[in-house]
Amino acid sequence: MLQVPGDVQILKEDNVTHSFCGLASVGWMYQKIRDSFFLILGTHTCAHFLQNALGMMIFAKPRFGIALIEEGDLSKNEPTLDEVIAEIKADHNPSVIFLLSSCTPEVMKVDFKGLADHLSTQQTPVLFVPASGLVYNFTQAEDSVLHALVPYCPVAPAGEKSVVFLGSVNDATADDLRAEAEELGIKVGGFLPESRFDRMPAIGPDTILAPIQPYLSRVAVKLERERGSRTLHSLFPFGPDGTRVFWEDLAREFGIEVDLRDREKAAWEKISRQTAMLKGKKVFLTADTMMELPLGRFLRSAGAEVVECSSAYINKKFLAKELKALEGVRVVEQPNFHRQLEDIKRLRPDLVVTSLMTANPFVGHGFIVKWSMEFMLMPIHGWSGVITLANLFVSPLDRRSKLPAFDKAVWLEGVMPAAE
């Protein structure tokens, strides 16, 4: 049992991370950095995973690809990728190439950093991104991408105070965040990442880093150490409560006092139908995206009973305010999934937020399920994302209320008795 400031107790268990591989981050990162190419050194398993997970056919010529490791490569000191890189440059003309690791070459002890340095040129740098599922879950790989981009962020001079938002969001959400900051009188230095490689924000000793995703602690620490920047430790801008606190805390960093309680009240009123459905509902969050703590905090504020809020990894300093807001909730790091399964059977929550891997088994047991990955892919940040966020939670409850009673026999038809 771990103790954190504010008497929040975190139960740490010993399970493996039930999460997508870090390579899944390619799905949103290549779309965000439009002049990039993501190259994965991996196996046929990696290729099948990406094609199925991202739903991308090869003739679409997406800006990501896999250099396959074959049996013959096992006897080589290092894989040779010069021809692959030349082909990528000819077909896509990227400004930057990200070289991602995967499990098999990690086990083979491939020197990815040396390989990236060898392939890199001044015109087209090749940046190593550790993303192996042996070490990282799929959201942490975004942290690795931003980590690799830090040397390409210009150094902002001392005295030039501005905010840089950390985290990949779509352009509409980025525009909303920028407009809100400027309306409050906060100077915006940019976003890490920006949509183009040559537009990465200048970061210096008077830059305030405002993380908008809860899994970017490593890049924040790197910027603090190397640039002297300061990280905003606040709630994340999910839901009316988190968005209000986020903007009030950020404004305070710039010497601006704002009171956004009326704005928060209006946002809650917009989702009154959704909160009425959530009120009193028991919700269980299993570990997957590392977004679980702010999502659990929003659910609690919306009137739901959060039975358990678990996450693969919990950085206690980075998430201190979220943890404080969850006082009294069972918070678990690296949860034991078998224990969770038994607890869920016993507690019978009204909604289980879980990974794609475990969703169907829970449905088979008669539970209402929400895929946690959907929160990664939808615009749920800030004031503009409040309705989308609330709808993500209530949509499965809505759907179940319109369906006939669950027929377990349909799921088990033709299955051997031992499988029940």
From Swiss-Prot:
Pathway(s): Porphyrin-containing compound metabolism; bacteriochlorophyll biosynthesis (light-independent)
Q: What cofactors does the UniProt entry give for this protein?
A: [4Fe-4S] cluster
Q: How is the cofactor bound?
A: Binds 1 [4Fe-4S] cluster per heterodimer. The cluster is bound at the heterodimer interface by residues from both subunits.
Determine if Transmembrane is one of this entry's keywords: no
Q: Which domain of life is it from?
A: Bacteria
Q: What does this protein do?
A: Component of the dark-operative protochlorophyllide reductase (DPOR) that uses Mg-ATP and reduced ferredoxin to reduce ring D of protochlorophyllide (Pchlide) to form chlorophyllide a (Chlide). This reaction is light-independent. The NB-protein (BchN-BchB) is the catalytic component of the complex.
- The name under which this protein is listed is Light-independent protochlorophyllide reductase subunit N
Species, as recorded:
Chlorobium luteolum (strain DSM 273 / BCRC 81028 / 2530) (Pelodictyon luteolum)
